[in-house]
């Protein structure tokens, strides 16, 4: 064929195959024919392969082809700003070890799956390989691809695609970017991966992002027409960065579809998601959603970035699993439409289906500046009043489990929301369970850990759900060596209406400071509901609250019953239990809305019904060393002088005496006045740091014949092996301080 210079410069066959690839120039369409077929595999080989904006690279394959395997053997990267197209349901592999960039107009028009990779070769089941760096004539195979082999320095992959062919958008009303057909796989496997306001869409299918290091091998495990990507032979990973300019030009990764959704897997060393956008997976119909799995050394979400799974139909939402040594969820940002986007990880049901679970396995988790991690039974906006009237969901929320071996920090707030871990319900669905297992937990500066049931009303104050069928608050279980709640930090399981949930804390040290709160109160809007239970088990540890800083442990019900508070601890300091009478007396009012220990400056424990004394709850405190509610011990008016022996009992072979020596410096009777003249002004003197005797005579050992008596120990010393030895004589010592010498002793 006769090719233009532009065509030759962009798509150039390298003539290394038994049957060479041919490129036909048909206007803005570059028709790719020929190539070498082996069974259901069709091989193409190019020296250069790039597609300009507005152009189409059309692989004109026969419909019986299963895999189109395309390699680039030259030294330049592939820049795809147009469309890649193929016939039938063939899968398309694009292999360029120099790098691949998808521009803002890049799109896919293929019936099968797409794998874009910067691997150096692809390996087949029979052991053969198709190499992009060793372009000699290969022995082509009819075998199935089983792996991607990378070189010493895998090149990056960039996606900037905001393509919307025929105006199509995804569920979030954003451009689809690179999109495959429903049920198919979209995979980018390379070195560093960048999504720069670029989106990936695979409705009901699978999205795979893998960032691998030098000499890695990624296994392709065939399934029914697709693959599972396995990284067991990868020794090190590279980084993935997902950024969004704004809401209109955001990076979205989604497999959401009308009848379900697929799976999303992202794996790398450092994974960063910045700006409004992220990884989003919803099922919109009756089928269940797929799962989201993130594997990383460090994961960061910031400035409104989100990883969310959910359901807007009857189908069950997918599970979200994060495995990363460090996880940071930071802040949020205002969008160009002037609403606040929260950085969040979560799972939500908006309608009838149950939400999936969220599991985070890490060493350290930090949620700061208004970031959220949430599982929720939420609601959906009614079409006639978007963002105003919410029809509550009936599906149940999922469970949230945090396993952080070292540290969990929930700290701070944004202008719109507090940093939080939460499992809540807004309607008839039940809230999920929230579990935190960590070495150290810090909830500070307005941070919250909460489960609960909340009521959302419309613009005229009406609740649109079933008021008589409200979901239950979930339970909250925390196990940590130490727990610090500080500066308006909260751990709560509260309800606006209905039954409060339960809180169980297992710890060795619980510290509460500056308006901190642990609460399972119910009926927050002055309605019915029983307070939940609080169990704090610090059997070998301590509970320490700063006095007069309004730190409270509460299990109150407004018109329902108070809950139970059970505390097992070795010591309880700075906080005391108050009953109804105590609260009324201290607050100075018996108004039920005022009988609340949070209105006091003291640190208190309370489990009452605010309206009905017969429904008060129970506070049980076991084995405290200090009972702060017992007050001071009364001393006798005339103290007795007891006879006390502080040494061995004297035998008849010794003489014993007790003397008080001095110039009335110490009174012999506690009723005698201590006058200021009894203690003279005396100077301190320095003593040389040398070996010296005490200023009394060392006792002499006396031998008694035929008397087998016990000699009272006069001192003790430590042998070199750590053994403590009692001695009958006082030792020589080296003083380390300046002793006080009274002038007249």
Where are these regions (language model features)?
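Extracellular and secretory-pathway beta-repeat/beta-biased strand scaffolds
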Residues: 1-745
């Amino acid at each position: 064929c006769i090719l233009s210079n532009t065509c030759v410069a962009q798509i150039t066959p390298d003539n290394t195959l038994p049957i060479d690839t041919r490129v036909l120039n048909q206007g803005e369409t570059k028709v790719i024919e020929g190539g070498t077929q082996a069974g259901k595999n069709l091989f193409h080989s190019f020296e250069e392969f790039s597609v300009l904006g507005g152009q189409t690279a059309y692989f004109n394959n026969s419909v019986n082809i299963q895999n189109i395997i395309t390699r680039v053997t030259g030294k330049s990267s592939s820049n795809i700003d147009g469309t890649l197209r193929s016939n039938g349901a063939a899968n398309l592999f694009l292999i360029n070890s120099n790098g691949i960039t998808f521009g803002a107009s890049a799109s896919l028009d293929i019936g099968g799956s797409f794998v874009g990779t910067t691997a150096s070769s692809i390996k087949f089941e029979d052991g053969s390989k198709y190499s992009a760096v060793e372009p000699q004539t290969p022995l082509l195979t009819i075998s199935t691809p089983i792996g991607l082999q990378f070189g010493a320095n895998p090149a990056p992959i960039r996606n900037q695609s905001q393509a919307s062919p025929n105006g199509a958008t995804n569920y979030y009303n954003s451009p689809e970017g690179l999109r495959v057909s429903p049920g198919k796989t979209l995979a980018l496997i390379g070195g560093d991966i960048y999504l720069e306001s670029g989106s990936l869409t695979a409705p009901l299918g699978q999205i795979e992002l893998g960032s691998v290091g030098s000499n890695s091998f990624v296994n392709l495990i065939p399934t029914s027409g697709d693959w599972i990507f396995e990284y067991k032979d990868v020794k090190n990973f590279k980084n993935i960065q997902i950024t969004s300019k704004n809401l209109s030009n955001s990076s979205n990764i989604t497999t959401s579809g009308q009848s379900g959704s697929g799976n999303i897997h992202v794996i790398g060393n450092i994974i960063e998601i910045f700006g409004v956008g992220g990884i989003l997976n919803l099922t919109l119909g009756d089928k269940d959603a797929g799962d989201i799995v993130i594997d990383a050394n460090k994961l960061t979400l910031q400035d409104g970035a989100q990883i969310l799974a959910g359901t807007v139909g009857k189908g069950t939402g997918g599970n979200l699993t994060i495995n990363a040594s460090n996880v940071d969820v930071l802040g949020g940002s205002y969008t160009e439409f002037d609403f606040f986007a929260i950085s969040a990880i979560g799972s939500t049901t908006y309608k009838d289906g149950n939400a999936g679970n969220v599991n985070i396995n890490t060493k350290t988790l930090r949620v700061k500046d208004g970031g959220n991690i949430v599982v929720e039974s939420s609601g959906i906006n009614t079409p006639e009043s978007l963002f105003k009237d919410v029809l509550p969901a009936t599906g149940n929320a999922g469970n949230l489990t945090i396993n952080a071996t070292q540290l969990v920090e929930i700290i701070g707030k944004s202008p719109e929301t507090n940093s939080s871990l939460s499992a809540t319900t807004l309607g008839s669905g039940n809230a999920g369970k929230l579990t935190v297992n960590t070495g150290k937990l810090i909830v500070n500066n307005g941070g919250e850990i909460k489960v609960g049931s909340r009521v959302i009303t419309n613009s005229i104050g009406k609740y649109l759900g079933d008021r008589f069928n409200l979901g239950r608050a979930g339970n909250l279980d925390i196990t940590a060596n130490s727990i610090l709640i500080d500066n308006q930090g909260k751990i709560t399981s509260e309800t606006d209406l209905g039954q409060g949930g339960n809180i169980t804390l297992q710890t060795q040290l619980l510290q509460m400071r500056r308006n901190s709160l642990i609460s399972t109160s119910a009926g927050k809007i002055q309605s019915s509901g029983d307070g939940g239970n609080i169990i704090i088990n610090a059997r070998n540890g301590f509970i320490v609250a700063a006095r007069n800083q309004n730190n409270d442990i509460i299990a109150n019900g407004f018109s329902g019953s108070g809950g139970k508070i059970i505390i097992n601890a070795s010591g309880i300091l700075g906080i005391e239990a108050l009953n109804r009478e105590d609260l009324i007396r201290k607050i100075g009012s018996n108004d039920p809305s005022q009988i609340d220990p949070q209105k006091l400056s003291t640190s208190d424990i309370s489990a009452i019904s605010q309206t009905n004394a017969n429904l008060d709850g129970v506070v049980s405190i076991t084995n405290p060393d200090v009972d702060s509610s017992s007050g001071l011990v009364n001393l006798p008016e005339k103290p007795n002088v007891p006879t006390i022996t502080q040494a061995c009992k004297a035998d008849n072979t010794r003489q014993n005496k007790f003397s008080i020596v001095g110039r009335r410096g110490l009174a012999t009777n506690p009723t005698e006045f201590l006058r200021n003249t009894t203690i003279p002004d005396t100077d301190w003197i320095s003593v040389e740091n040398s070996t010296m005797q005490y200023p009394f005579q060392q006792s002499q050992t006396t031998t008694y014949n035929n008397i087998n008596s016990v000699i009272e120990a006069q001192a003790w010393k430590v042998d070199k092996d750590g053994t403590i030895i009692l001695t009958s004589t006082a030792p020589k010592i080296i003083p380390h301080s300046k002793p006080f010498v009274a002038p007249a002793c």
